Amino acid sequence: MAPRKNKVAKEEVQVTLGPQHLVGETVFGVAHIFASFNDTFVHVTDLSGRETIARVTGGMKVKADRDEASPYAAMLAAQDVAEKCKTLGITALHIKLRATGGNKTKTPGPGAQSALRALARSSMKIGRIEDVTPVPSDSTRRKGGRRGRRL
């Protein structure tokens, strides 16, 4: 029988989530707020937009379908996202606000303003606020047919 080999102790690698930073340093993330009239998404990524840090919707916070787009649901979603960001070390956010856009409405839903205010009140520093609603240069045909929506 061959002699037994001694097991080599493996070094444990410490894995940390979130960006590497110094204590007290402001670390930026990007909060993508998509506010339609049916729901509100608050999605925080790193600066490149590739790595998702937290994503919460208004529908995840309330039970009734009619309340998904409400300002209250958006506020709860934004507070939840801010809490997750703080645990991962993100202290400041750039805001990208988006409405449905395209050939539909270009105005953000009711949850947009309350989500932004909730992020600001939860001691997150706000960097730049930008509207990224897709606006067509020449739109496709709207829904409703030749004679339009008849009430």
From Swiss-Prot:
GO MF annotation list: structural constituent of ribosome
Pfam family, one: Ribosomal_S11
Compositional bias per record (Basic residues), positions renumbered to this chain: 142-151
Spans through the membrane: none
GO cellular component: ribonucleoprotein complex; ribosome
Keywords: Ribonucleoprotein, Ribosomal protein
Disordered: region residues: 131-151
PROSITE patterns on file: RIBOSOMAL_S11
Annotated InterPro entries: Ribosomal_uS11, Ribosomal_uS11_CS, Ribosomal_uS11_sf
Matches recorded under NCBIfam families: PRK09607.1
Family: Belongs to the universal ribosomal protein uS11 family.
Official protein name in the record: Small ribosomal subunit protein uS11
UniProt source species: Bombyx mori
Species classification: Eukaryota, Metazoa, Ecdysozoa, Arthropoda, Hexapoda
